[in-house]
Amino acid sequence: MCQIAGVSRSGFYSYMKSRNDKDSHLNRKEEQDKRDFDLILEAYSYKGYDKGSRGIRMRLLHMGIRMNRKKIIRLMRKYHLFCPIRKANPYRRITRALKSSNYADNLLERHFEDYGPGYVLLTDITYFFYGKERNKAYLSTIKDAFTKQILAYVLSESLEEDFVLETVNHLLRDHSGDIRTNAMIHSDQGCHYTCIRFIDLLKDRNIRQSMSRRGNCWDNAPQESFYGHAKDEIMKYVKEASSFEELEKIIDDYMDYYNSERYQYELSKLSPNEYLEYYKTGIYPLKDLVDENEKTIKKFDTVKANLKRLEEEKDQAAASME
């Protein structure tokens, strides 16, 4: 056969060996891809909440596994695993026609993280259609702008202002020791936040009120972002909820997951609770797997410098009054 083909016997066997080696390499690569994709699937569906490539990578890190994000994206495409696409918060349409004149100034001016935890608190409302009959429920939350923790939330069947007041009361009940002197609550210009009862509640508790400029969602961007991601991750369960009580359980479970295990790149790949602990202790829990983020270290240093300056200004003001 080699004579007919005009090739040497050694050349023929060398060719066959290289082809077998190539096939063997491809088989090994395919097997490795399958093993890696099994890990990706485990991370993707952890606690039942779908994740994108970044969320998967961060979950893998917390499982003690390093995997390049490019590989994760490649394998997701190869095996047709798609992450959810975020949707806009529809609450704006509810309150557009219900404005008042009790607007607060925009004290925040997008300085979300300058003074550490417990200083800037973001609040907003969104709604869900749940169950086959598409019943409507409303969710009010208060989020720490620095740690991204959800500090208080209330789910309601009614859009009456009471459930927004209840959200603030939950915050004061559960986190009174964590709220800093001169803290502010920042919201949009919705009717719930311009009502006299809400304004008086904040004044009674010495919490400053700040509001976004009209029609400018970027002034409350971290809160908007939370609702967008949350809806992507829980909507499949919300649609199947057969009662308001079942929806409450879905929201409760998600809030626990979000604060404890919903990792975020801007939080140095940590969950909100872990990020708060990292800020307090200076100990980075993933240091054996990834390097600490230099931007985060600088941010912590800036916050501490800002707090020191505030204390000095406070002392100077007190001394001038003596």
Label for each model-derived stretch:
Residues 1-22, 250-270:
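K/E-rich alpha-helical interaction surfaces of small helical-bundle regulatory domains
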Residues 2, 12, 40, 56, ...:
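Mobile genetic element proteins and their domesticated derivatives, centered on retroelements
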Residues 2, 13-115, 216, 272, ...:
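Basic, flexible linker segments flanking DNA-binding modules
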Residues 7-11, 35, 163, 197, ...:
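Generic alpha-helical secondary structure signal
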Residues 29, 94-95, 187-189, 195-199, ...:
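RNase H-like two-metal-ion nuclease catalytic core shared by retroviral integrases
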Residues 66-141, 166-170, 174-175, 180-181, ...:
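Mobile-element integrase/transposase regions
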Residues 144-145, 156-160:
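A short acidic/small-residue loop/turn micro-motif
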Residues 203-207, 229-322:
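C-terminal domain-tail junction helix/linker
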